[in-house]
């Protein structure tokens, strides 16, 4: 499609390819996290520089944006959502919640703009977003201080997990 794209390959227990799908727009789209969902599909999360183009049907807000794509058990897109502010927003972790929605964890350099309701306090702050089962934002929260704070699945500072 464009630069980098999401590439998903489903394999069986013997390593045989069952299906594969490339999803992206006309610029760079980088997949950083995925999880099987309770309905047997998958939720894909990453960051995108693409505007509406190719498979991407959501606008960009400026710089990198969170890009969430829900696919079914055969790899077909069910829905997608792009969210962010006017600067750089990088999605690093996604977990399904007990209500069928998702909690997203990443970091942001965006001030109030687009989907961001709070200013960035440092260079990058944690940006936590709760979405419902169809990808609609329910709430979002910026957590940070006057330093760089990064959120990703392997971080010892902040892990996005459900307890």
Task: Pin down the residues of each PLM region.
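A sequence-level/structural motif corresponding to short, flexible coil/turn segments enriched
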Residues: 1-163
């Amino acid at each position: 499609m464009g630069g980098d794209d999401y590439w998903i390959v489903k394999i069986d227990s013997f390593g045989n390819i069952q299906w594969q799908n490339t999803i992206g727009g006309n610029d760079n789209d980088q997949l950083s996290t995925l999880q099987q969902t309770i309905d047997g599909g998958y939720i894909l999360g990453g960051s995108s520089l693409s505007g509406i183009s190719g498979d991407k049907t959501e606008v960009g807000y400026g710089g990198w944006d969170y890009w969430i794509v829900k696919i079914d058990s055969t790899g077909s897109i069910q829905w997608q959502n792009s969210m962010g502010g006017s600067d750089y927003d990088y999605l690093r972790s996604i977990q399904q919640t007990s209500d069928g929605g998702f909690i997203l964890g990443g970091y942001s350099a965006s001030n109030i703009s687009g989907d961001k309701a709070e200013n960035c306090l440092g260079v990058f702050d944690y940006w936590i977003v709760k979405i419902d089962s169809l990808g609609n934002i329910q709430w979002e929260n910026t957590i940070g201080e006057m330093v760089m704070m990064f959120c990703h699945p392997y971080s010892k500072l902040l892990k996005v997990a459900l307890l």
